[in-house]
A protein has these predicted regions:
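Exported/periplasmic ABC-transporter solute-binding proteins
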Residues: 4-41, 45-54, 58-62, 71-74, ...
Length: 249
């Protein structure tokens, strides 16, 4: 996976742009990582595209120029591999996370609908539950599977407020527009004054963030260098500081 130093230096001299498509829940962390990468690679600019993982793969399939893909689950990266959108030999897990059930924490909403656990979502008082769209948002798929495993999906499904990304769920919670919602632990930590975690939700599969170089990367050498940087201590420190679990070797 190592990029040629000569290729990287050539890209720097040309003022190259490396395009990174990253899952929405990684947005804030990836912006900081991108800044650190740019400081270490003078002349290179990172263009960050943040959206739901499924949307990112759709964009690639439609021909969007991407150098590195970072998804929020293995299944989405598996799909990208099947469609030959990424180089499977470069695939690495860069971080982990946890799914949580959260509620609004603003004073004017606290206590209106008592939600203390997953089971409370089945009570009549709970009318609006935000989750990411399971077809494109990995956190939404994790949430649906957790509700199904708890025998709550049939009850909760009519109350669901669908979201285009996990960050949109967070916005709904922060504004008190829903009674509860499923986000990642790191998302809830970004809004401690407005969002409160009530339960870490067991998931059928670990929440992992795989990354890979795009098969048609416009800047393949820089793409490999950026992926290497994601696994380096400076980038991992950023991810740890924002609550992500360590990368898996």
């Amino acid at each position: 996976m190592a990029a040629s130093a000569q290729q990287v230096q050539g890209a720097q001299a040309q003022g190259a742009v490396v395009t990174v498509s990253a899952a929405a829940s990684l947005g804030d962390a990836m912006r900081e990582v991108a800044q650190r990468f740019e400081r270490q690679h003078t002349g290179v600019r990172v263009r960050l595209n943040v959206a739901a993982s499924g949307v990112l793969v759709q964009q690639m399939a439609q021909g969007a120029p991407v150098d590195v893909l970072v998804s929020a689950d293995a299944a989405t990266m598996d799909r990208a591999q099947r469609e030959r959108l990424v180089d499977a030999s470069t695939r690495r897990v860069i971080a982990g996370n946890a799914l949580v059930l959260a509620v609004p924490n603003a004073p004017d909403h606290t206590g209106v609908v008592p939600v203390r656990s997953l089971n409370d979502l089945g009570t009549p008082q709970v009318r609006r539950v935000a989750i990411g769209k399971p077809a494109t948002v990995p956190a939404g798929l994790h949430a649906r599977e957790a509700l199904e495993a708890a025998g709550l999906w049939a009850t909760v499904a009519p109350r669901i407020v669908p979201a285009d990304s996990v960050r949109q769920v967070l916005d709904y919670l922060a504004r008190g527009e829903v009674d509860a919602g499923f986000v990642y632990r790191t998302d809830a930590a970004a809004q401690p004054a407005r969002v409160r975690v009530v339960q870490v939700v067991p998931t059928a599969r670990p929440v992992m963030y795989p990354a890979a170089v795009a098969q048609q990367a416009p800047q393949p050498a820089l793409a490999r260098e950026f992926l290497r940087f994601l696994l380096s201590e400076p980038a991992q420190a950023v991810l740890r500081d924002r609550g992500f679990a360590p990368a898996v070797p």
